[in-house]
Amino acid sequence: MATACKRSPGESQSEDIEASRMKRAAAKHLIERYYHQLTEGCGNEACTNEFCASCPTFLRMDNNAAAIKALELYKINAKLCDPHPSKKGASSAYLENSKGASNNSEIKMNKKEGKDFKDVIYLTEEKVYEIYEFCRESEDYSPLIRVIGRIFSSAEALVLSFRKVKQHTKEELKSLQEKDEDKDEDEKEKAACSAAAMEEDSEASSSRMGDSSQGDNNVQKLGPDDVTVDIDAIRRVYSSLLANEKLETAFLNALVYLSPNVECDLTYHNVYTRDPNYLNLFIIVMENSNLHSPEYLEMALPLFCKAMCKLPLEAQGKLIRLWSKYSADQIRRMMETFQQLITYKVISNEFNSRNLVNDDDAIVAASKCLKMVYYANVVGGDVDTNHNEEDDEEPIPESSELTLQELLGDERRNKKGPRVDPLETELGVKTLDCRKPLISFEEFINEPLNDVLEMDKDYTFFKVETENKFSFMTCPFILNAVTKNLGLYYDNRIRMYSERRITVLYSLVQGQQLNPYLRLKVRRDHIIDDALVRLEMIAMENPADLKKQLYVEFEGEQGVDEGGVSKEFFQLVVEEIFNPDIGMFTYDEATKLFWFNPSSFETEGQFTLIGIVLGLAIYNNCILDVHFPMVVYRKLMGKKGTFRDLGDSHPVLYQSLKDLLEYEGSVEDDMMITFQISQTDLFGNPMMYDLKENGDKIPITNENRKEFVNLYSDYILNKSVEKQFKAFRRGFHMVTNESPLKYLFRPEEIELLICGSRNLDFQALEETTEYDGGYTRESVVIREFWEIVHSFTDEQKRLFLQFTTGTDRAPVGGLGKLKMIIAKNGPDTERLPTSHTCFNVLLLPEYSSKEKLKERLLKAITYAKGFGML
C-alpha cells in the first residue's frame, strides 16, 4: 500500500489505462473468435459444439445475427472450439484471392531487398513518392501495394495521412501504433466490430483512438470549416498512382475493408464527436477520380456510401461547405459518381410494387450522399440569403366551428407546418436562395430512378417519416417535375378525402347536413361575381373548406364535374381576371407578361381571391393560362424581388439601370438625376416618389448609384405592390399552406405546375394516344385525323386541346403525359365530334372522307362552348 502511495498520479493513470486497454483487447479477441466460429466454423467436420458452424446440426445465420450471438456467447463464457488445421477462414481466402499476387511479391521482395516499409503508419505526399520511386527502380510495386492496402484500409491511419501540418501529436501516433500491434493479419468482418462496439463503454471507446482534441494544441489552430488535410497533395498523389492498374486494385480492395469499419465507428463510437479530423478520410476517398468505374460499383462504392450516410449532421454540413469551394468540374465528378451508382443499381435489378427501389440500401445510401453534393452545388453557386419576404402577415383565419377531432379532444392530424430539410437548417441556405448553382439542377435528376419509383408507396413513407423506410421525396432534387407532381397529387387527394370523411362524421355528430365538396354554382355570364363572392364567404367563414375537392356547376347546363367542368371554370375566370380593362394587372406588350397594378382600385379582398383561385388550380390539378414573370413565383415562395428580377419583369427599366451602373463618366454631372422617381397612375397622371427621405435633394453619383438601383428595384417589385401582393400571397397560402409544395418545387417548377408546358409536341401526343370502340392506330380515319391535326396552325392546335382536354396547355411533362383516348362514335354522319374533357376522350364518327373530317373537326373546336349530357 505504501508503495502505491509513492506512485505519481501520472504513472498510476498510465498503468490503469494500459490495463484497461489490455482487458478490452482480450475481450475483443474473444468476441471475434466466437464470431469466426459462428460464421466459418472450426474446420472439424465431426464437431459437436452446437455453437460452431462446422457442427452438422448448426443452423446458419446472417452476419448481424452472428455478431449479436457472439456477444451473448462471450457473456456466458461459452465453449470455444480448437481451430482445425484443414479449415481456412473465408476472410483469409478472400484476402488471398484479392491480394495473392501482392503476397507472392512480398515474399520475393523481403528476400531480395529486405525493405517492406512496415514502419510507415501514415502517408504524406513525399512518402508516397519515395516508395513509388523505390518500387519503380526495383520494378516491383508490391511494397507500395501493401502500404496502400494497410493505410487506406485503416481509418486511423488515413485520418492522419496527407495533413497540411507535418507534425502529429504523440497521442495520435501512440494510438495508431497500438492499433497496428493489435491488428490481426486478416481484416475482421464489420459485424464482429459492431458486436465489440456494443460491449465497450464510451470511456473505453474514447481511449481507443486517443484524445485528438488535446493533441491539436501542438498544431496550427483551424477555423470551424477548415480541414487539416492537404487536398492538392491528395489530387497529385491520385493523379500519379491511378494510372497504374495494380495500384488501382489496391485502392479498391482497401476501400472494401475500410468502409464497414468506418460505418461501425460512426454508428457506435461517436468518433466524429471525439475527433473532427475523422472527416479527412471521406475527403481523401472522394478525391479518387475512379470511384465511378465499374469495379467500384459492385461493392466498394455502395459500402462507402453506407458509411458516409452515418456522418452526423454537423459533419455533413462541414463537408458540404468544403465541397462548395470546389470547381464546377469537381462537383460534377462527384455528382456523376453517385448518379452512376444509382443508375447501375436501378438497371441491374427489377423493381416493382413488391420489390421497391426504396428498399435497396445502395440506392438509398447513394441518394443521401448525392444530397450532400447537391447542397454543395447550391452553397457554392450564386446565393442570396437576404431579401426574404418578412412573414408579418396576419395568420390565416381558422374555422369558427369545431372540427370533429377538436370535438373529440384531438388536434387535426394534418395540421403541420411546411417540412424543412435538416441540412438547410444546418447550412443556413435554401435551394430558393441559389440564383445560379455551380452545375444545373437538371443534372441531378435521375430518370431511370424516376421510371421505377412507386410514387404511391414513396409518398406513404414520406408522410409517415419512419427510420425504417426511405422516401425519395426527401431528396426532391433527384426527381423530375412529373414524379414530384404525382407526389403532390397524392398529397392533395388524400387531404381532400380526409376533409370529406371529417365532414361526414361531423354531420353525424352535429346532426347537420354539410357538403363534403367545395361546391360552386356559377352563371357563365357572371362568373367572376358568382365565384369570387362565394369564395370570399368561404374564406371568411371556414377556410378549411377550401381544401375540399372542387365541384363546379354551370347554371342551366347538364355537365357533371369530373374535372373537365373545373378546367373550363378556371379558364374563364382567368380570362376575366386578367382583362386589362378591369385594372387589377398591367400587361406588357413587349414581354407578353402581366404585373400587379400598383394603382388598382380593387380591394385587398379581390387580390386574396385571385390567390385562392391560383392555389385551387394547383390543389385540383388544373392548368391555368396565366403569364407572370418568374419573380412572382419567387415571391410566392418567400423571396423579395431584386434588381436581377427586373430583367424578366421590366426589361426596359432593367437595361436603363444597368447602363447607369456601367456608365464610365460622371453620373452626377452628366445625368443630373436624384433619388426621386416618377410613376404614372391608372389615368396616366405622373406621381413622384422619394426612394429616400428628401430624395429630390440627393443627387445620384458614381458612389451611390448602386444604392439607387437597389432602392428603385425594391420599389418597383416590392413596395409599390406590397398591399396587392401580400393579399394575393395570403389567398394562395390559404389553400397550399399545409402542402409540401414549397419543399418539393423550385419557382421554375411552380410555374410549370400552374401554367403547364409551353411546348406542344403533337408527335408525342400521337404516340401515346389510345383507341377504343373499333378504332386502331392503323384505321384510315385515324391516319387521316393525325394528318389533319399535324397540319393545324398553332392557334388551331390550342383550340383542339381546349376542346378535348378543357385546357389549351400541355400538362407537366408534355403532351405525352396526356393519355388521350379516341373512341369510335358511330358510322358516317353529319354530327360534330364531341369530347369528355374530364377524361380526355374524343368521340369521333367514322366520316366518309378526309375533307369532311377536317370540316367537321374545325367547326367543333372553333365553336365549342358549354356542357351537355350525351
Curated annotation (Swiss-Prot):
Q: Does the keyword Zinc apply?
A: yes
- Span list, region Disordered: 171-223
What residues make up the catalytic site? 838 (glycyl thioester intermediate)
Q: Which InterPro entries match?
A: AZUL, AZUL_sf, E3A/B/C-like, HECT_dom, Hect_E3_ubiquitin_ligase, UBE3A
| Main location class | cytoplasm
For bias type Polar residues, the affected ranges are: 208-220
The answer to whether the entry has keyword Transferase is yes
Mutant lacking the gene: phenotype? Mice with maternal deficiency display autism spectrum disorders, characterized by motor dysfunction, inducible seizures and a context-dependent learning deficit. Long-term potentiation (LTP) is severely impaired despite normal baseline synaptic transmission and neuroanatomy. The cytoplasmic abundance of p53/TP53 is increased in postmitotic neurons. Accumulation of ARC protein in neurons, resulting in the excessive internalization of AMPA receptors (AMPARs) at synapses and impaired synaptic function.
Q: Which residue stretches are annotated zinc finger (C4-type)?
A: 42-81
- Which reaction is catalysed here? S-ubiquitinyl-[E2 ubiquitin-conjugating enzyme]-L-cysteine + [acceptor protein]-L-lysine = [E2 ubiquitin-conjugating enzyme]-L-cysteine + N(6)-ubiquitinyl-[acceptor protein]-L-lysine
Keyword vocabulary terms for this entry: Biological rhythms, Cytoplasm, Metal-binding, Nucleus, Phosphoprotein, Proteasome, Transferase, Ubl conjugation pathway, Zinc, Zinc-finger
Q: Any idea which residues bear Phosphotyrosine here?
A: 654
Q: Where in the cell is it found?
A: Cytoplasm; Nucleus
Top-level EC class as recorded in UniProt: transferase
Query: Which miscellaneous remark does the UniProt record hold?
Result: The Ube3a locus is imprinted with silencing of the paternal allele in hippocampus and cerebellum in mice.
Q: What interactions and quaternary structure are annotated?
A: The active form is probably a homotrimer. Binds UBQLN1 and UBQLN2. Interacts with the 26S proteasome. Interacts with BPY2. Interacts with HIF1AN, MAPK6 and NEURL4; interaction with MAPK6 may be mediated by NEURL4. Interacts with the proteasomal subunit PSMD4. Interacts with BMAL1. Interacts with ARC. Interacts with ESR1 and WBP2.
State what protein this is by name.
Ubiquitin-protein ligase E3A
**Lineage of the organism:** Eukaryota, Metazoa, Chordata, Craniata, Vertebrata
